[in-house]
């Protein structure tokens, strides 16, 4: 299993959560059928606009999809945050230490 640091995490103008890996790309993430997508231009994984799931649940889904693709994504000391409220950031950070595909 490869490990990659998450360069940045944010919420875009459409309300979608995105996660940008430092070095890995995921052009085939759609094959996991998890509603997680790869944005080629922004070089990031992203969720649909949350409906029933919270942003934390979508973060776990993105991390799980990457795990199924053979990469463990980890939040690092240098991870940048964009458009994420402090309480949501804390919740995402708290969830990042859990098993990548547990209880999504």
Regions found by a protein language model. Name each.
Residues 1-104:
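Accessory DNA-engaging acidic/polar modules
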């Amino acid at each position: 299993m490869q490990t990659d640091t998450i360069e940045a995490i944010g919420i875009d103008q459409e309300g979608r959560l995105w996660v940008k890996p430092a070095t890995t790309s995921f052009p085939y993430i759609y094959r996991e059928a998890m509603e997680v997508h790869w944005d080629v231009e922004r070089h990031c994984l992203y969720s649909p606009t949350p409906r029933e799931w919270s942003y934390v649940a979508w973060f776990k889904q993105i991390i799980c999809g990457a795990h199924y693709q053979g990469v463990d994504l980890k939040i690092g000391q240098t991870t940048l945050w964009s458009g994420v409220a402090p309480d949501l950031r804390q919740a995402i950070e708290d969830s990042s230490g859990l098993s990548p595909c547990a209880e999504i």
